[in-house]
Amino acid sequence: MIEEPYLNTHSGSLRWETVIGNRIRTQQTFQVSRVDAREERFQFRSDWALGLTDKLTLRLQAGVADEDPAFEAYYGGVSLAYEVTPHWQIDLGYRRYEDTGEITASNFNTAAPGLSSAEYTISALYQTGSTSVRASLGIFDSDFDPITNPENTVFANLFRDREFVTARIAFTRTF
């Protein structure tokens, strides 16, 4: 049984897509979220896909989030996709993320300190009909700011700097 207090979250977003010529597609997203006992969080994200050739696509992504009194996040990424055959695609990617740390409304919590992270990936995508399978390998590096709240030092091992290999497999079936 869940007891009070509850944390309710309400959010809304506006998303629009634009096609520029026959080789550029953009998508912009603006979102506002509100969690009980906190200020609104405003987020903006911009995605671009540029067809460099018939088989080579460059994708760019950038975003920002802001919540008073002191949370800010910035993120971005770039990937290059090459269509080897009509069913197979190879991607190289890089993502970067930075924030100032979690905002909390309570005294004792697991609020994360500021974070800088980066990920480098290579993936292969197989598509046929309404089915696709993607396998990827990457290197992920996270660098946390020091924990400054003495009540959160119990979580010091959770928020320590790490570098590790990531592996993902995703299966998608559209119907």
Segments and roles (model prediction):
Residues 1-175:
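Gram-negative and organellar
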